[in-house]
């Protein structure tokens, strides 16, 4: 078994398919089974011509192959369609290959039709080839299935030996990311985020025997992301669950190839609905769709896997829940997104940023509890701001909650100083600050308090040394091609708390826009002054777009949200920089970007409803001069603000009044008199304005009253027409009722007649069934007798075939035995002759040895005789000498 020539490989090449239907949600997998060993191909897209390009191989020796060929062991290829969302596996068809067709020489591939195919209209086929190859490696076992060599991948040579199962995410707390793969090669940054947008029919998960905690149970969703436990905000109503869509994000430092390898071996993302420490239901979300898209599309845009997934109760609760239809099943809307960060690598390398440590410690950490977000909004930014935040949901119906989630996301990373807001068209709910148009905005920040008593308790904000003074302007210029089916009185609304104000900013007044018409928006220009770190504004603009809402203001009904659009503020960062001189002669930089974007509907198919043209500008005035500013808590009030006093003066106490003869007292008296005069003038102006506004209000009231009267008359006329129609319909109904009564009497008669006919036909059918049954029984008896006779013939023929096979085998064995017997006789005769020759040679040798021994014996005897005689002679000589 250890020789190379005895080891073979049965190789089944699965090349491609044809005549398959296209199913975007499914993948095709082929399982090949041979002698109890099963191999599978990689999942491929379910297209008309799927490309498998896979080889499956089994290792065995020639003796085992011969036995399998005698037994006609088949190779069965089963084709399955795998649902990427629910992981359901359904059979498409199968192919059976004959092992005897496998040859060691190369053969052309053939097309095989799928048997028992699910797609009966298409008749799908698979191109296959089966062959034998010599295995050059010594065999260890007699039979063992093994996988063919892996296909070539795009992983570089340095990572060729990297096993996907050995990849483990390592948390880098200092930089705020998870490292997957070797750090010297994996240097790209990715963001993996999971958003739970909505949930429905959750009450179906509560069995009748389950007792919920008192007095008011709280429910929440739980899942694990890269080893981090994530829960959303609890909610109490299962019938109408209301919770803000939340996004959990983790930053990953890896490469596209290594990240795909890591995702390929990860289990499905499991999301649980929990009450306390008990799981009421869960759903599994496969990451295969994300993996397939990430390998191709992630370089161009984020890849997303989203949908509504059905929650299934745990095994112990399934028996207590009744079956519900599909439309009543508990579902959860989830979106999983994987995005590659472009242009942020330089931000996270301290060597590339010549700034202080406080300015460099901005990278975000992985997941934390969402409750910490509120603390981060009140306190100065920590070295590692949180990245877990409420994000815009995937459903456009939750547009208002998108704005709130963006607001909370901004609060997670506040700017390093109190920003100023300046606007030529301020929002209705918040007046502009008096110091917003000042050329030195930082001094305006420090002089925002009303008086010295208020400034003593004002909040101090320390500006880091690396902070820059920025001015960001937004100009929503025009809107056109509004296509909603009716004229629109549109206003645009947006909010970006990072600029320092969470109040929404709106264009005013509303403008009427019709189809195929472009309108320039009034009071659409707004500017924001603030101080922050350069890389913090870059990171915020890249992560959070500006959400702009298109509203229709109707005088008679409630305001209607028509559509939304997102402005990518990061586009201004990539535009060309132009140099200009600031108000103090300093060198400043300006970046401007303009674009026309589409506004999509919030409901329905999310079609395009309008086009918006905008211009955004970012001005960098350089480093902030003032390192500590004082901001009053009432900085956004409508009262007058003293913007010229420094912070040190505001914190000092007022001096004691001097005698009346001093110039200061006279100046104060004149100032008070001037104030009273100005106050009287101001009151008169207010009264005049009030009169004008009251007249305008009266005219508007009269106009609207006339409109209401006309509308009421129109409605009365319409209702009169409807009343006539209803009376006519009532008469028709009475007529139809009488007709129905007559038809009912006729129907009863027909029913009785039909009953008689039915009974008669039933009797006739029973008689015919009895006759047919008797005929069938007789026919069955005949067929049974024929089958019995055929079975006997089959047994006889099988015995005859078996005897013939045994006779043939015996004849071959006898002939082989005779040949072996003749060879044995010849070998025996040759051995006997050789044995006789050897015996004769041994006999001669023994005779020679006996002769030599006899001669030696005789010589020894003669020697003894001579010795004896010598002794006797010696004795005689001795006697004679005596």
Curated annotation (Swiss-Prot):
Where does it primarily localize? Answer: cytoplasm
Q: Is Repeat among the key words of this record?
A: yes
| Pfam families, alphabetized | C2, DUF3668
Low complexity composition bias: which ranges? 423-436
- Give the span(s) annotated as Disordered: 348-443
All residue ranges annotated as the C2 domain in the record:
1-112, 453-582
Superkingdom classification of source: Eukaryota
Q: Does the keyword Transcription regulation apply?
A: no
Q: Where in the cell is it found?
A: Cytoplasm, Cytoskeleton, Microtubule organizing center, Centrosome
**What keywords sit in the KW lines?**
Coiled coil, Cytoplasm, Cytoskeleton, Repeat
Q: Which residues form a coiled coil?
A: 709-882
GO cellular component terms given for this protein: centrosome; cytoplasm
InterPro entries referenced in this protein's UniProt entry, alphabetically: C2_dom, C2_domain_sf, CEP120-like, DUF3668
Query: Could you say which protein family the record assigns here?
Result: Belongs to the CEP120 family.
- Report the function annotation for this chain: Plays a role in the microtubule-dependent coupling of the nucleus and the centrosome.
Q: What is this protein called?
A: Centrosomal protein of 120 kDa
Q: Which organism is it from?
A: Xenopus tropicalis
The gene designation is cep120
């Amino acid at each position: 078994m250890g020789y190379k020539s005895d080891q073979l490989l049965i190789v089944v090449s699965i090349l491609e398919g044809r005549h398959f239907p296209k199913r975007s949600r499914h993948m095709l997998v082929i399982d090949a089974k041979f002698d109890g060993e099963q191999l599978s191909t990689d999942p491929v897209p379910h297209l008309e011509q799927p490309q498998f390009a896979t080889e499956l191989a089994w290792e065995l020796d020639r003796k085992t192959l011969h036995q399998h060929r005698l037994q006609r062991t088949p190779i069965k290829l089963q084709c399955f369609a795998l649902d990427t969302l629910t992981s359901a596996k359904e059979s498409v068809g199968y192919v059976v290959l004959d092992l005897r067709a496998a040859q060691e020489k190369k053969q052309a591939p053939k097309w095989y039709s799928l048997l028992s195919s699910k797609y009966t209209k298409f008749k799908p086929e698979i191109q296959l080839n089966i062959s034998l190859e010599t295995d050059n490696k010594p065999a260890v076992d007699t039979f063992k299935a093994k996988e063919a060599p892996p296909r070539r991948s795009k992983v570089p040579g340095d990572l060729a030996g990297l096993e996907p199962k050995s990849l483990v995410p390592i948390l880098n707390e200092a930089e705020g990311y998870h490292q997957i793969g070797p750090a010297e090669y994996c240097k790209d940054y990715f963001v993996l985020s999971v958003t739970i947008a909505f949930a429905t029919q959750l009450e179906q998960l509560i069995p009748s025997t389950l007792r919920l905690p008192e007095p008011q149970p709280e429910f929440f969703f739980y899942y694990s992301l890269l080893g981090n436990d994530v829960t959303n905000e609890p909610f109490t109503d299962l019938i109408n669950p209301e919770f803000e869509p939340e996004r959990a994000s983790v930053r990953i430092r890896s490469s596209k190839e290594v990240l795909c390898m890591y995702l390929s071996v990860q289990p499905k993302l499991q999301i649980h609905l929990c009450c306390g420490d008990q799981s009421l239901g869960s759903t599994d979300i496969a990451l295969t769709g994300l993996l397939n898209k990430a390998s191709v599309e992630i370089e161009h845009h984020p890849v997303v896997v989203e949908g509504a997934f059905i929650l299934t109760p745990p095994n112990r609760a399934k028996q207590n829940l009744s079956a519900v239809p599909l439309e009543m099943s508990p579902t959860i809307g989830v979106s999983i997104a994987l995005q590659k960060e472009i242009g942020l690598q330089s931000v996270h390398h301290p060597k590339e940023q010549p700034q202080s440590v406080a300015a460099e410690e901005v990278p975000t950490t992985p997941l934390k509890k969402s409750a910490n977000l509120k603390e981060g909004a009140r306190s100065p930014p920590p070295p590692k701001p949180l990245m877990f935040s409420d994000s815009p949901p995937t459903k456009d119906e939750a547009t208002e909650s998108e704005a709130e989630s963006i607001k909370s996301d901004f609060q997670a990373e506040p700017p390093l100083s109190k920003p100023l807001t300046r606007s030529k068209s301020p929002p209705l709910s918040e007046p502009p600050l008096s110091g917003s148009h000042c050329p030195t905005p930082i001094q305006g920040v420090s002089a925002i308090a009303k008086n010295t008593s208020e400034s003593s308790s004002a909040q101090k904000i320390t500006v880091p040394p690396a902070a820059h003074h920025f001015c960001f302007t937004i100009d929503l210029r025009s809107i056109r091609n509004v296509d909603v089916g009716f004229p629109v009185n549109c206003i645009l609304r947006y909010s970006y708390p990072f600029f320092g104000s969470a109040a929404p900013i709106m264009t005013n007044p509303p403008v009427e826009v019709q189809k195929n018409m472009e309108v320039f928006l009034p009071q659409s220009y707004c500017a924001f002054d603030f101080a922050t770190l350069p890389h913090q504004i870059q990171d915020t603009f890249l992560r959070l777009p500006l959400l702009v809402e298109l509203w229709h203001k109707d005088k008679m009904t409630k305001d209607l949200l028509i559509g939304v659009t997102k402005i990518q503020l990061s586009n201004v960062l990539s535009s060309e920089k132009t140099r200009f001189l600031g108000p103090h002669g300093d060198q400043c930089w300006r970046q401007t970007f303009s674009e026309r974007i589409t506004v999509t509907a919030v409901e329905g198919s999310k079609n395009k409803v309008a086009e918006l043209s905008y211009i955004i500008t970012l001005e960098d005035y350089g480093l902030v001069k003032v390192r500590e500013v004082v901001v009053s808590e009432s900085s956004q009030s409508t009262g007058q603000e003293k913007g010229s006093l420094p912070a040190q003066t505001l914190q000092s106490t007022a001096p004691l009044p001097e005698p009346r003869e001093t110039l200061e007292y006279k100046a104060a008296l004149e100032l008070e008199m001037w104030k009273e005069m100005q106050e009287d003038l101001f009151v008169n102006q207010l009264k005049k304005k009030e009169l004008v506004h009251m007249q305008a209000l009266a005219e508007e009231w009269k106009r609207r009253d006339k409109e209401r009267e006309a509308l009421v008359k129109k409605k009365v006329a319409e209702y009169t027409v409807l009343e006539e129609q209803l009376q006519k319909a009532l008469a028709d109904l009475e007529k139809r009722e009488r007709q129905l009564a007559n038809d009912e009497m006729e129907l009863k008669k027909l029913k009785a007649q039909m009953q008689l006919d039915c009974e008669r036909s039933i009797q006739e059918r029973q008689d015919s069934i009895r006759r047919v049954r008797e005929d069938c029984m007789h026919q069955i008896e005949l067929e049974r007798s024929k089958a019995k006779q055929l079975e006997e013939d089959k047994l006889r023929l099988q015995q005859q075939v078996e005897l013939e096979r045994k006779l043939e085998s015996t004849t071959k064995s006898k002939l082989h035995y005779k040949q072996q017997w003749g060879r044995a006789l010849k070998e025996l005769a040759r051995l006997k002759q050789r044995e006789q020759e050897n015996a004769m040679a041994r006999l001669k040798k023994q005779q020679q040895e006996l002769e030599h021994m006899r001669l030696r014996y005789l010589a020894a005897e003669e020697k003894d005789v001579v010795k004896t005689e010598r002794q006797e002679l010696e004795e005689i000589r001795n006697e004679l000498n005596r």
